[in-house]
Design a protein with these regions (language model features):
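The catalytic Nudix box helix
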Residues: 69-70, 85-123
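Nudix hydrolase/Nudix homology domain
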Residues: 2-14, 45, 82, 124-209
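A glycine-rich, hydrophobic loop/mini-helix early in the fold
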Residues: 56-91
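Residues that flank catalytic or metal-binding motifs in active/ligand-binding sites
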Residues: 26, 55-57, 64, 88, ...
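Secondary-structure boundary elements
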Residues: 62-65, 111-113, 153-155
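Acidic, metal-coordinating catalytic segment for phosphate/diphosphate chemistry
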Residues: 3-58, 62-64
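Hydrophobic alpha-helical segments and helix-packing faces
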Residues: 52, 77, 81, 85, ...
Length: 209
């Protein structure tokens, strides 16, 4: 039995139902295609039906040998459960910068603190929309943040991260057949492709950082 099928103690609900209920109490930042804020949207509404375009980020942390740290989404996740992602991905909340949101998720999900990496840089931003089975969708303007880890130790939270591994970034892009057992999240695949194919759109310092 997977974690997604197990009930939380005393609740009678599965972990996935708990996550859905939690999402229903949270908001994301609705945005234009240019990432200009238009208001707030309920997080569950933003990921069901036709969805709502909203602000998001994905972070890629590298070691000094050019390997990227991939994290597997826990099986309790409603969307892209057990798929492999970049290091972390999520949504900033109202009033929170992309950099601060990224630092928070790195600490919460992987126990990685700011002193372990150099400056987080926003290297790209793109819009995408993808559906996942009959569970929902992502419709995001996604910022890409990158940094190099000088201290590569981490301590993953199993409620959020099912597994983690270091992978040669260039090899993953150029030889995907070698990694076909890894189901990759679409936003990570897009970010990686844009990185290598020269489509990345550098973001000026301080612009919605």
């Amino acid at each position: 039995m997977s974690e997604a099928d197990r009930s939380s103690p005393g609740s009678g609900k599965t972990d996935r139902e708990d996550e859905t209920a939690e999402n229903a109490t949270q908001d994301v930042i609705a945005v234009t295609p240019d990432d200009e804020r238009t208001g707030l949207a309920n997080r569950l509404d933003a990921h069901t039906g036709d969805g709502v375009r909203h602000r998001a980020f994905t972070c890629l942390l590298f070691d000094e040998d050019g390997r990227v740290l991939l994290a597997q989404r826990a099986d309790r996740k409603r969307l892209w459960d057990t798929h492999w992602d970049g290091t972390v991905a999520s949504h900033p909340i109202e009033g929170q910068s992309q950099v601060d949101a990224t630092r928070q998720r790195l600490a919460e999900e992987l126990g990685i603190e700011p002193h372990q990496y150099d400056k987080l840089e926003i290297t790209d931003r793109f819009e995408y929309k993808r559906r996942y089975l009959d569970e929902g969708l992502e419709w995001e303007v996604c910022a890409v943040l990158q940094a190099t880890l000088h201290d590569t130790s981490f301590d993953r939270d199993p409620e959020e991260v099912g597994g983690a591994m270091w992978v040669d970034y260039e090899d993953l892009y150029e030889n995907p057949r070698y990694y076909r057992q890894l189901r990759l999240c679409p936003w990570f695949e897009i970010a990686m492709r844009r990185d290598f194919e020269g489509d990345a759109d550098p973001v000026p310092d301080g612009t919605r950082a």
